[in-house]
Curated annotation (Swiss-Prot):
Residues 77-147 are annotated as: Effector domain. Keywords: Acetylation, Glycoprotein, Host cytoplasm, Host endosome, Secreted, Signal, Virulence. This is RxLR effector protein Avr3a. Residues 1-21 form the signal peptide. The gene is Avr3a. Changing R81E: Does not affect PIP-binding. Belongs to the RxLR effector family. The lineage of its organism: Eukaryota, Sar, Stramenopiles, Oomycota, Peronosporales. It comes from Phytophthora infestans. InterPro entries: RXLR. It comes from the Eukaryota. A motif (RxLR-dEER) lies at residues 44-59. Gene3D superfamilies: 1.10.10.2460. The keyword Glycoprotein applies.
Amino acid sequence: MRLAIMLSATAVAINFATCSAIDQTKVLVYGTPAHYIHDSAGRRLLRKNEENEETSEERAPNFNLANLNEEMFNVAALTKRADAKKLAKQLMGNDKLADAAYIWWQHNRVTLDQIDTFLKLASRKTQGAKYNQIYNSYMMHLGLTGY
């Protein structure tokens, strides 16, 4: 009898301590005064962008989705290793191009097996392991992962 009372009292105390700790963290997170946030802290490491577009550094080439050739992403039609490798390298180097490819593949119902065959053709030595990022990103695009 005494053990049951001690266990229930312990459970109540733990519940009370947990609930009060959660309320305090909400106050700390939502109640941060604005004067503690420094405006320059978030921008300290960023470089100033130059206004002249010709001299500013380009991180990625200009990309226009309207100019894409539909046959470019057709992995089923790729039979030459050089073409497959070229497309895989382009997809690895340009996120916008990769996103466009994922959308095109999803629209044309390209299966993961076809993507795997394409990647194995692109890198025969590693059996496609070199381009796992493309395969995994396409899986995430399709929503087949736990994220």
